[in-house]
Curated annotation (Swiss-Prot):
Region annotated Disordered, chain positions: 1-22
Gene Ontology MF annotations: structural constituent of ribosome
Protein name: Large ribosomal subunit protein uL30
Keywords, ordered alphabetically: Ribonucleoprotein, Ribosomal protein
Domain of life: Bacteria
InterPro entries named among the record's database cross-references: Ribo_uL30_ferredoxin-like_sf (IPR036919), Ribosomal_uL30_bac-type (IPR005996), Ribosomal_uL30_ferredoxin-like (IPR016082)
Length: 64
């Protein structure tokens, strides 16, 4: 029986206006594009790296 994949919920708390293009692209990669949006993502090293890159724009709500 396979283990369930761990997930992480991330909410965008600040705007992407006047941010570097790479930070905007990272938000799109995290499935976030508006303040208040919440995305449930798989908890992988790649996702953690993307969150770290835009940590000033998002917050982690829940880690399951």
């Amino acid at each position: 029986m396979a283990k369930a994949a761990k997930t992480i919920k991330v909410e965008q708390t600040r705007s992407a206006i006047r941010r570097q293009h790479s930070q905007r692209s990272t938000l799109v990669g995290l499935k976030l594009n508006k303040i208040g949006r919440v995305a449930e993502l798989q908890d992988t090293p790649e996702t953690r790296g993307m969150i770290a890159k835009v940590q000033h724009l998002v917050r982690v709500i829940d880690e399951t």
